[in-house]
Amino acid sequence: MSQALTLARPYGRAAFAIAREGGTFAPWSDALAFSAQVAGDPRVAALLLNPALGQEQAVTLLAPPQAGEDYLRFLGVLADAQRLSLLPEVAGLYEHLRAEAEHVVKATVTSAAAMSQTELDTIAAALKKRFGRDVDITTAVDASLIGGAVIDTGDVVIDGSLKGKLARLQSSLAH
């Protein structure tokens, strides 16, 4: 996986540079998400390895209908370098660079039960205060947490779940 990220990094940076230059962050995000989802399908991944599939056909297969010329050229460069399989990693790197440029922290809040909008607003305000950036929250529900929530911002994980607290208590009692 780390090798894929290393190989994808220059393409993620290039996509970001093109989008920044054109002021088209959102369309590039949408296009990369589409292409990454298609390329991530095992059947499509196998098809991309087929030498009978031409580069133009591969680009057509992976490009969203609304793709602009810059994006099609970008896919062509990936096809020329035989790096179309890296699209999921390229999309992830692009989103990371975009969030940095827009001063946004992406956080995933996983809780034992669905959270109210008021609770999410409170968490968003606390994270904004801590990181000094706007917060984009994605939610998930995992009943195995028993109670509480786990907040993952990529670099920082805050485990306030009952499951996590019990695990820490068990660890401290064992030692």
From Swiss-Prot:
Keywords of the record: ATP synthesis, Cell inner membrane, Cell membrane, CF(1), Hydrogen ion transport, Ion transport, Membrane, Transport
Major localization listed first in the record, in broad terms: membrane
Database matches in InterPro entries: ATP_synth_OSCP/delta_N_sf (IPR026015), ATPase_OSCP/dsu (IPR000711)
Superkingdom in the source lineage: Bacteria
Short name of any one Pfam family annotated for the protein: OSCP
Location of this chain's protein in the cell: Cell inner membrane
Protein topology in the membrane: Peripheral membrane protein
Any GO CC annotation of this UniProt entry: proton-transporting ATP synthase complex
GO molecular function per UniProt: proton-transporting ATP synthase activity, rotational mechanism
Record family assignment: Belongs to the ATPase delta chain family.
Record function comment: F(1)F(0) ATP synthase produces ATP from ADP in the presence of a proton or sodium gradient. F-type ATPases consist of two structural domains, F(1) containing the extramembraneous catalytic core and F(0) containing the membrane proton channel, linked together by a central stalk and a peripheral stalk. During catalysis, ATP synthesis in the catalytic domain of F(1) is coupled via a rotary mechanism of the central stalk subunits to proton translocation. This protein is part of the stalk that links CF(0) to CF(1). It either transmits conformational changes from CF(0) to CF(1) or is implicated in proton conduction.
PANTHER family: ATP SYNTHASE DELTA CHAIN (PTHR11910)
NCBIfam families registered for this protein in UniProt: ATP_synt_delta, PRK05758.2-2
Subunit organization: F-type ATPases have 2 components, F(1) - the catalytic core - and F(0) - the membrane proton channel. F(1) has five subunits: alpha(3), beta(3), gamma(1), delta(1), epsilon(1). F(0) has three main subunits: a(1), b(2) and c(10-14). The alpha and beta chains form an alternating ring which encloses part of the gamma chain. F(1) is attached to F(0) by a central stalk formed by the gamma and epsilon chains, while a peripheral stalk is formed by the delta and b chains.
The name this protein goes by in its record: ATP synthase subunit delta
Protein source organism: Xanthomonas oryzae pv. oryzae (strain KACC10331 / KXO85)
UniProt gene name: atpH
